[in-house]
Amino acid sequence: MTTTMPATADGWDALLSDGGVVRIRPATAADEDRLLALHEAASDRSIYLRYFSLNRRAGDRYVDKVLHGGEDEIVLVAEQQGVVVGMAGCTRLGRTADGEVAMLVADSHQRRGVGTLLLEHLAAVARRAGMRSFVADTLADNGLMQQVFTDAGFRVERHSDVDVTHVRMSLTPTPQAQDAVDLRERRADVASLRHVLAPRSIVVVGASDRPGSVGGAVLRNIIAGHYRGDLKAVNPNRRWVQRLRAYPSVLSLPEPVDLAVVAVPGPAVEQVIRDCGARGIPAAVILSAGFG
């Protein structure tokens, strides 16, 4: 239904429009502090567009409602590296098949497709729960939210009332909805390859000055090829490698890079890859031997 990697018991990993990975999963009561932090970090404009006022206590009440409101509430979160970067919830309206939908995405993650992914997954969950339509009231100048409904590809009806737009979105799958998903998948797949094919920054893990070492040869070739991006080296035993400052581990890098080239012994690879994930590095090329 969306650009989704294999589902796990606690959610689905999905590609964003820029090739980044986000986990979409059901929210639980244990997420309360994370959802409150999402609201606290939101700009005044984001709060105003979401709640039609600058009253931040409205966010606190909403979080309490969706987490503790019972079976009529469905709420999903988008998570990156353990941080909730977006949430979407729907409330069944009485005994109808309508669900009132609302969402909030962290300012720094807007325009990456987080809202669209949340809406797609929420629609699938709500449909399985017997809902047939989403309804929402949005401010007329909330262009991002209007675009999220459009990008989902479902049939959408809009009616304007002064500064508010009333939206009704059918949850019935359509060829147009599938076409929209397919287009997003292709674009996200292409974007995800940029980190490998055209990285703006690289770290060589296992970089060395030692003649004949794979890490040393890789680093020399990158330098000799006049790579124009940001180049870093990781070697726990050296402070400098081939005139580059060497960091003791991936976790000690001052900022994430696009690509890690891993040239360490096979038994050390798993921990390096885990460290890359924890540091927010989206892609890795493994040149190691010694697996078995």
Annotate each PLM feature.
Residues 1-195, 199:
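Long, contiguous binding/interaction regions
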Residues 174-292:
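Catalytic-core regions of core metabolic enzymes
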